[in-house]
Amino acid sequence: MNSSSFYSLLQKKFPFQPTYKQDIFFQKIAIFLTEADNNTIFVLKGYAGTGKTTVISTIVNSLLDINKKYVLLAPTGRAAKVIANYSNKPAFTIHKKIYFPKKSSGGAVSFTLQQNKHTNTIFIVDEASMISDTNSDSKLYENGSLLDDLISYVYSGTNCKMILLGDTAQLPPVNLDISPALDIRTLGMNYNKEVEHIELDEVMRQEENSGILHNATELRELLKDSFIDEFKFDVKKFKDIVRLTDGYDIQDAINSAYSNYSIEDTAFIVRSNKRANQYNEQIRTKILGKESELSTGDFLMVVKNNYFWLKDSDEAGFIANGDIIEVLEIFNIKELYGFKFAKVKIRMIDYPNQIPFETVLLMDTIKSESPSLTYEESNRLYQEVLKDYEGETKFKQFQKVKVNEYFNGLQVKFSYAITCHKSQGGQWNTVFIEQPYLPDGINRDYIRWLYTAMTRAKNKLYLIGFKDESFVE
């Protein structure tokens, strides 16, 4: 099938009248998918509500017509679950797909890039704004970074190409100013690829009554300005975005979100770990009535990658920073090595096929204001565990610490309230956002933070602690 016939087919299969930009996208993608050249990357950028998911579902459901296969990928388990839900097709995390874990004799894990055995396959990668081109975890990243490895993996396959999807108004990866996987110059210059791209910027007619999208689009437009001095929410004419000022109203809203939907379909997004800790404590005691330091039914977020507890054949492969778990059983809580640990049975909520398993939680990170154990704390734990194996050779000691279950305890925090970076790639039915402390006033970083937080909400958004002047009269 040539590109013009494929373009006609895409138009036919698309469930709506395409917007001007969507139509151009279909023309461009039809050429990209039918031409033989394998040195091109396609970047589809799009604001919230502009139909990225709908056009991509149409593509996925049409690839068979041109004898192409597809693989759906995302940076996190939660983001993979989102793309799987909207496309009704299986999706994987990038890590699970492209890396092969190797355990050394010492018990340490290192990851090797897998061989891409796919042929005639289009790799569709969602939430690409989260993909970094810097080396942040030396256990991974053969070529220096996740983006390097992803491009290297995909384009080493026979007739394989990649479509990167994302929204440049979202927060970039930690410590970066831009999202390199959506940056046309970075992709062209650093990876020696041709880059075809388009940005969808018209909100679809079906979404025009959404207050969440109306306000998100206003924020998105602000980012085009060179100077940003204020933003006012427009909540009056919308039912899906609500301002809360009274403590009792906040409690009622959280209660009803938990009972009408579920705890795991509700997120409370704040600016710092300190605020998240405070809200988690309040929510657990006042709303969920949990008095002990850990209870069955508690939801926690893992805050550091952990390669110890799962086998490669498990659905998740490893337990990643940002994965949410539910505590099903608590066997014991004890102090050891100067730290506190809980032996528990958990399920991973973003991996429905992952069988629940027993593990050890490191409790000290729950109240900590740092994102995970500090270097000093990790070192202290290492030295204490090492004492258990005195009298062994240095190498034996090292080997035994590496497989000690307490040394490998999952670092966790409660996940009722989380920071915005941790929420990225996820969607929740109900989202609460607290106005952060802004010592420098409103700036571009804050607008991106707010935009990212707001667009995590599918149906209802509550705004807490925002001043009167933050709203349209």
PLM feature segments, named:
Residues 88, 283-287, 448-452:
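Short, solvent-exposed amphipathic alpha-helical segments in soluble enzyme
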